[in-house]
Amino acid sequence: MSVPASSFLLLCFLMNSFSPAQSYILPHCEPVNETVSVEKDGCPKCLVFQTAICSGHCLTKEPVYKSPFSNIYQHVCTYRDVRYETVRLPDCRPGVDPHVTYPVALSCECTLCTMDTSDCTIESLNPDFCMTQKEYILDY
């Protein structure tokens, strides 16, 4: 029994189109520009500005069989090289240091999440979330 060429080509197309690796394209872990906010107790305004953060997809594997003796961990997109910058919050009360220092991503990598430097929660607040009145820096 021979398979017509058109059926063979259709079969090849369908096999490739449903490949997990090719069914969608996700951006790889890399620095991206993002609007973020900083605020501090004693300062009535939240400062909103753009900076480079790490964002993107990291390949991960999850075992089919999960044993209580096996370690399961996932890699996340996080900072490799950073530079620190400082901004000054407006209208802070006397005695409150108005300066806030934040990391700027220079390069990123897929690695285990470090709670000391990263937000490792499943879903966190948006990066530009503010509890107080927002003030924008327009000259990024």
Swiss-Prot record:
It is found in: Secreted. GO terms for molecular function: follicle-stimulating hormone receptor binding; hormone activity; lutropin-choriogonadotropic hormone receptor binding; protein heterodimerization activity. GO terms for cellular component: cytoplasm; extracellular space. Residues 1-23 form the signal peptide. Keywords: Disulfide bond, Glycoprotein, Hormone, Secreted, Signal. Pfam families: Cys_knot. This is Gonadotropin subunit beta-2. Involved in gametogenesis and steroidogenesis. The keyword Glycoprotein applies. The gene is cgbb. GO terms for biological process: G protein-coupled receptor signaling pathway; positive regulation of androgen secretion; positive regulation of estradiol secretion; positive regulation of gene expression. Disulfide bonds join 29-77, 43-92, 46-130, 54-108, 58-110, 113-120. Its main location: secreted. PROSITE patterns: GLYCO_HORMONE_BETA_1 (PS00261), GLYCO_HORMONE_BETA_2 (PS00689). Belongs to the glycoprotein hormones subunit beta family. Glycans are attached at residue 33. It comes from Ictalurus punctatus (Channel catfish). Heterodimer of an alpha and a beta chain.
